């Protein structure tokens, strides 16, 4: 199937309340200011070891937006996945050869990582002999040397693969969830979701679904915080720093579902999905500011032109935003399974022609968003 649909402005019919807005200026709270009721935080101290009960969920207190798609992208579905594999596509990434990799949630004994050439042809699967079964495929990223990094949320590992698909490094221990604690010689991960890289090759790992389940959090004897976190390692996997989001309020977060590094200044952007916001730190983990959004922040991506993109997950759109959180354009027709729609898109990739790609965790398909060849788009990208 290779269908196209011009991005229009018609909105889908939805069962939840949605607001259409052609212009939105995000609320920005900097150091010393309170986000307050906008994100549902009560300001109270977090519950013992399970901070989830101290947070007001953004889904419940913030009105969602579906914006008119205004960037002129069209939609195509040229990638053929293997017959019989119906798992959702957790993530996609593109290497320097312009080959696309897709990370699929498939059952044990079936492949989960696929490579497609620039003509959309599937050229290989990286098998379980290299990566084992990924209990819950989540984020994926490709570094400057074309190494492939994959996150197994429920297996609690992050794996680094060579461009040829050979396993080079495993961070964490499969099936052992907990803290990374250098003082104990304990190097465990807690539901890793995504990976991002600093300009010097340093690694940032976002971990965050732990906060969704207090019972799960409290049952782990190896974990002392039960909190979402960012782990900072050097390019060889040596520990540098980490910071936690185990309190409500400024400088904290409930989830690290999206993660991106500004290549120009090294600032780390966290997509705090359930609080509908970006939380920004410098490269050393010092809090910079919070930027309140009006949608789920499910994925963040920096394109080859150093532009920032945000996936709204179950809100069914992708936004181009600036580094201050201002929405510059929208792609997608809202939640659904139709053309130009998404049930839950999280992670993206862009080729050198400006085409954008994403998967869907609930649908076994990869969407190619074909960039318009307009003067506006050329101006943006040059």
Q: Where do the PLM segments sit?
A:
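Positively charged n-region of N-terminal signal peptides that target proteins for export
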Residues: 1-4
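Bacterial N-terminal signal peptides
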Residues: 8-17
């Amino acid at each position: 199937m290779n269908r196209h649909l011009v991005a229009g402005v018609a909105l889908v019919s939805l069962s939840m309340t949605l607001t259409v807005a052609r212009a939105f200026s995000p609320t920005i709270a900097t150091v010393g200011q309170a986000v307050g009721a906008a994100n549902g935080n009560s300001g109270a101290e977090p519950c013992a070891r399970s901070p989830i009960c101290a947070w007001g969920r953004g889904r419940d207190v913030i009105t969602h937006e579906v914006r008119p798609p205004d960037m002129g992208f069209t939609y195509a579905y040229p990638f053929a996945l293997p017959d019989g594999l119906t798992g959702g596509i957790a993530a996609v990434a593109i290497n320097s050869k312009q080959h696309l990799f897709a990370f699929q949630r498939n059952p044990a004994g079936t492949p989960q990582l696929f490579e497609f050439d620039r003509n959309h042809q599937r050229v290989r699967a990286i098998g379980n002999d290299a990566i084992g079964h990924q209990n819950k495929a989540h984020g994926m990223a490709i570094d400057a040397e074309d190494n492939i990094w994959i996150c197994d949320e429920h297996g609690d590992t992050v794996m680094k693969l060579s461009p040829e698909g050979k396993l080079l490094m495993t961070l964490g221990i499969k099936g052992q969830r907990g803290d990374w604690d250098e003082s104990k010689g304990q190097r465990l991960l807690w539901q890793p979701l995504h990976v991002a890289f600093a300009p010097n090759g340093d690694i940032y790992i976002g971990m965050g679904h732990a906060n969704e389940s207090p019972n799960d959090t409290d049952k782990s004897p190896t974990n002392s915080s039960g909190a979402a976190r960012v782990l900072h390692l050097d390019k060889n996997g040596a520990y540098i720093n980490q910071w936690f989001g185990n309190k409500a309020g400024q400088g904290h977060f409930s989830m690290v579902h999206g993660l991106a590094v500004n290549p120009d200044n090294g600032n780390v952007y966290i997509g705090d999905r359930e609080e509908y916001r970006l939380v920004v730190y410098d490269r050393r983990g010092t809090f910079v500011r919070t930027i309140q959004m009006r949608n789920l922040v499910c994925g963040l991506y920096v394109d080859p032109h150093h532009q920032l993109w945000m996936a709204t997950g179950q809100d069914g759109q992708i936004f181009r935003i600036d580094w201050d959180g201002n929405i510059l354009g929208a792609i997608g027709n809202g939640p659904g399974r139709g053309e130009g729609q998404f049930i839950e898109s999280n992670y993206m990739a862009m080729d050198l022609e400006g085409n954008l790609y994403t998967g869907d965790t609930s649908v076994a398909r990869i969407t190619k968003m074909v960039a318009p060849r307009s003067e506006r788009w050329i101006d943006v990208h040059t």
